[in-house]
Each structure stands twice: as structure tokens, then as C-alpha cells.
Amino acid sequence: MVSLQVSPLSQTLILAFLLPQALPAGVFELQIHSFGPGPGLGTPRSPCNARGPCRLFFRVCLKPGVSQEATESLCALGAALSTSVPVYTEHPGESAAALPLPDGLVRVPFRDAWPGTFSLVIETWREQLGEHAGGPAWNLLARVVGRRRLAAGGPWARDVQRTGTWELHFSYRARCEPPAVGAACARLCRSRSAPSRCGPGLRPCTPFPDECEAPSVCRPGCSPEHGYCEEPDECRCLEGWTGPLCTVPVSTSSCLNSRVPGPASTGCLLPGPGPCDGNPCANGGSCSETSGSFECACPRGFYGLRCEVSGVTCADGPCFNGGLCVGGEDPDSAYVCHCPPGFQGSNCEKRVDRCSLQPCQNGGLCLDLGHALRCRCRAGFAGPRCEHDLDDCAGRACANGGTCVEGGGSRRCSCALGFGGRDCRERADPCASRPCAHGGRCYAHFSGLVCACAPGYMGVRCEFAVRPDGADAVPAAPRGLRQADPQRFLLPPALGLLVAAGLAGAALLVIHVRRRGPGQDTGTRLLSGTREPSVHTLPDALNNLRLQDGAGDGPSSSADWNHPEDGDSRSIYVIPAPSIYAREDWLIQVLF
């Protein structure tokens, strides 16, 4: 049996060569912001069932390609599980709120070059806790699967996904681990450059700036000063240097056509290759030399150092939430997303608070249901945006001669005398407020209230006092004076004469209009059994009278009136007959 002996120096060299190959090219990072019920998706219960509290974990799976792969396929690019997730402590059966995850970072390392196109699978798992958990300890609560395009080294991309009644908010990015760099993490950091010496007829020598501080993983022996690499086990020379390890300087010699001397003066060599020799730009990109290096001008739809990463197109479905994808007019943009109402962002990934625009009119309440916008209108308004003012009085009239008045989205009834309430269906006593002053008696009339004044008082509400001895009258009692208040106020002589003259003129006009001869009286007849009215006897004769049931109505019908029984306090409504005012002497007696 032959044993293989490896010296310590050889072991060191082998480890130095293999160790960089085991380092990850980069890492995919996913930050979970919140997990909870989504708007308009129902009211989910707590993720913990009735067996006790639980804890949520998130599993991230990365698969190559842009096609929708089966969820059972392997996570070829890598997978990871979240850690340090807080315990969900809501009581079972209660509505679930959004679960914030301050430490919800999931890291998925990848060893090969980042493909740029991949499928992202995010699974939410529930771990049941407590002594009475029972059953399986782990249960799959939700799964999100989507296609993505992403270049390494770019900013965080934010996304919102819904599944069932749950909504997941997260961000993700891909970044390279040193010494890998580039959009695909396939280019390794070149070693530190140094000034070089260039001879006449050769390309100008400009040292490369340092691209990173990590050690080189180039071909063993590659000059750290004059060589660099973009792939493992590679050694590419800077301007002015040549050879397999970039250790042979290019100097001036007798060689023609820009050739340089070979090793040990065995011949002439061509100058070192230029950065754009062979066109390192892929997918039709054009190369240009810049300070000893090169830059690729990529065609539309590609990016990266060598245009090796394919850009996102509308065929990949980059627009979320129903956004419409069209080809971008900007040559640097492969697509443009036209977002539906309620969403914004380059990929329509951000939700807009549509209620902040106040779409509901006339004080309506705005409700954003996620898939639609609803307005809850106030009473008296209708329409999708509460823009229609309804006729509040349509189809609903006021009773007993009341008039409907609308305004401000509501309606009210202006009731006739003797009625009240919302629809004028309730009897009202107009004399309940005792409007007649100085002991005057109140009676209800079809045209308003009638006050029968006590001796020595006059006016619509018995507000004027007249002294019997002819002294100056006093002015009306102040507002709010009670009927039983014995206080009196005198009118000035000039004002008293003016009032008397005005009343006399009004009386003559009434006499002229109202006066009729015998047989011409078509108004309501005098109540049976009453005496000829006078200033004092008329109110007493009409007081506390009641119309019997079944009495006729109309201006020419006669009615029998009786005195009510004791304890009857119903209001009396009297329509005076025109014959009451037919005597001139009575009118003059009342006025004067």
C-alpha cells in the first residue's frame, strides 16, 4: 500500500488555491417588514389556533430562470430560514393585526455567478408553542411565488404580495462578497496596480486605480503589480508587461512593427493586448478604452460590465398590481409600467392612499377596500361619490296642512297652527306659552292667536295699559313680563293720541268692509245662547266651550255648544262670526 506524502508547503499552497474557490460569490438578502391581514381581503383570525401562542418563521428559496417553476423543485440557488422571530401573542379567535418584524432579515449565500433572472419563493411557517400544542409542530401558513430580475449591487427593491387573506411586505437585494465584483459577481478584484514603463511606439501606460482591498485570486505567481484577473486562475497583464505571469517588461528594441524583444533575445514579440482586443463586450455592446481599462456601451435591454446581464422586458411581467407594461421610450429603459389607479412606482409596487384625495363629496365617508373605492354617503345624498342631492320631501308629505321644508340633506315640517311634531301629527296648544300679558286670556283662531285683555289693557298681546281717569298711558310692559304682574307703564300723551287715531281709522275701515244688512250674513253664526258681545262679555261667552261630536262644519252650518264637564282641559278653537263685528257702537266701545 502506497501512501501519499504531502509536504506542509504543498498543503499550504493547495489550501491557498482552494480556499478562495469555496468563498461565496455573493449573498441574496430579503428583509421582511410586516405580515398580516390585507385590506379588502376579509378579516383573518390570529395565525395561532386555539391551542395557544405560536411563532412565525419565513423560508426563502431561490431558483434559477424566469419561468414559473414547480414549488417542489430544488432551490438550486440557495435557501435560508429566518431567525430571531418574536412570539405571536395575540389571543386565539381575535382579529389579527400586522406583525412587524424588526429583525426579519434572511440571507441566502450563492457560490456561482448571480444569474440576474430567478424565481423567488417565500413561505410563512407557523410553529405551535405551549404545553398543549399537540399535532404537527410546523404548519405552512402562506406561500408567495414570483419571477424577478435583479442585478447584484443595486439598491433595495420593495414589494408587496398577497396570498389568501394575508399580505406580506418585504424588500430584497443581491450583493457581491469580496473579492467578487460586478453585476453578476463573476469578476474578481484585480490586484493593486503600479506605474509601468512604456517604450516609444507602444500604447500609453496608465496605472489602474485600486478596485478593492481584497487579495487577488488570480493564477498562482501572477504579478501583483503588473497583472490582474477577472476569472479564477487567470493572469492578464497591464500595459508594458507581458508573459504568462506578467513579469516580462516590454522595452524599446530593434524589433519592427511595434514588436518587442522576446525572452533571452530569442525573437520579437507583439505588444501586450489592449483592453478592447477581441471586443469583451457581449450581446452587441461596443467597447471603448478608458485610462488603460475599457467600458462597454450596452444595447437596450442589457447591462453589466460586459453587457452580460439581460435587462427586464415586458415578457417578464415586471409590472405589479395590474400595471400595463409597454416598451420604454428611453434607450436606457427596457420597459415602462403604467400603473392602475391606486398604485405608483417604477413597477407599480407602491399603494397610494386614494382617500387622501377626498373623492367623496358632500361629507361622504371614504372607504378604501383595496380592490375598489367606496363612499358612504350622508342622509339625503347618493351616487358613487355622493354627488346627487336627493329630494328629501319627495314622497313624504306633512300631515294636517303642514309644509315640507328641505335643506342641508335633511327635511322638516312647518306645521299649521295647533299641530306639532316631526310630521305635524301631534296636537299642540298654542296658548301653552301664555302669550297674553297682564292677565289676558288666550284663544286659538284659524289665523293666529287671539288675546282677550283684562279691563284697562289693550293691544295684540294686551301689552298696552290705559288708565280709566284719562291720565297719560304707559308704554308696553317689557318682554318677559308675566300676565299676573301688576306693574304698569304710561304712554306719553302724544303717543296715546296717535295710537287712538290709528285704531279709529282701522275700525272705520273694518266697518265699511264688514257691515252687512239682515239676511246677508254668510259667515259662521253666533253661538246659540250668547248675548250681544261687548268689550267684557265676549270673551266670557266664548270661554270654555266645546263642539259636540257629530256637529256639522262649513260656514253656514249651525253648531250646538255645551259647557264641558269639570276637569276637562282641552283647548278650544273658535272661529268668530262676522256678525260679531257688525255693530259700530261695539267697535267704538272696544277701541275707546
From Swiss-Prot:
SUPFAM superfamilies, A to Z: EGF/Laminin (SSF57196), Growth factor receptor domain (SSF57184)
Protein's UniProt keywords contain Membrane: yes
Bilayer topology annotation: Single-pass type I membrane protein
Positions of disulphide bridges: 218-229, 222-235, 237-246, 276-287, 281-296, 298-307, 314-325, 319-337, 339-348, 355-366, 360-375, 377-386, 393-404, 398-413, 415-424, 431-442, 436-451, 453-462
Chief location: membrane
GO BP field: cell fate determination; compartment pattern specification; in utero embryonic development; negative regulation of neurogenesis; nervous system development; Notch signaling pathway; paraxial mesoderm development; skeletal system development
Residues annotated as domain EGF-like: 214-247, 272-308, 310-349, 351-387, 389-425, 427-463
Domain of life: Eukaryota
Residues that span the membrane, as ranges: 491-511
Residue numbers on the Extracellular membrane side: 33-490
Cytoplasmic side: 512-592
Signal peptide from the UniProt entry: 1-32
Annotated ranges, domain DSL: 174-213
GO CC list: endosome membrane; plasma membrane
Span list, region Disordered: 548-567
Expression tissues: Predominantly expressed in the neuroectoderm and paraxial mesoderm during embryogenesis.
Entry keywords, A to Z: Developmental protein, Differentiation, Disulfide bond, EGF-like domain, Membrane, Notch signaling pathway, Repeat, Signal, Transmembrane, Transmembrane helix, Ubl conjugation
PTM comment: Ubiquitinated by MIB (MIB1 or MIB2), leading to its endocytosis and subsequent degradation.
Disease: A truncating mutation in Dll3 is the cause of the pudgy (pu) phenotype. Pudgy mice exhibit patterning defects at the earliest stages of somitogenesis. Adult pudgy mice present severe vertebral and rib deformities.
Quaternary organization: Can bind and activate Notch-1 or another Notch receptor.
Name recorded for this polypeptide: Delta-like protein 3
Biological classification of the source: Eukaryota, Metazoa, Chordata, Craniata, Vertebrata
